[in-house]
Amino acid sequence: KGLMVLNHNGTPSDPSDDSYRVLTNEAGAGGLTNIDVYSITEDLDGEIWVGTLQGISVFYAPDAIFSGENFDAQTILIEQDGNIQELLATEQINAIEIDGANRKWIATASSGAYLVSPDGIDQILHFTAENSPLLSNNVVDITINHSNGEIFFATDRGIISYMSDATNFDEEIS
């Protein structure tokens, strides 16, 4: 298990110049938090966020995967109750979505949904079945309507939406 990354070198129809790497949880081989991967997304800064069985791994320089440099993923370190720990290290991350402000909406298998700052350090919102209309703490997917900021949470008990404040601005002003 793990994650396979393919570089088709700009010629997807010519496999003779392709290269690939298998990323695992070993140091020097990807450094994922876990080899069971549930979600992969690219944020607005080009960083790759990977949701696993045990938290989140971030590739800050994804081009380094094929350059031979140190390409291991990093974890987000946060302070909680005076302790330094990895962001959602004990959670199965089912989905990560990026809104128009580059914030991360994170779906977990047992703790509801989180909204964190663009760097992942600050928790902005935490929705659970106990503190919100969220139908279940098992959030299996999140989708964002970028034109109006509406966030859709798919749970094992149904879908509910939330009107967020971050949208993508597509109209050009001259």
Please report, for each region that a protein language model flagged, where it lies by residue.
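Carboxylate-rich, polar loop motifs that coordinate divalent cations or form catalytic acidic clusters
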Residues: 1-174
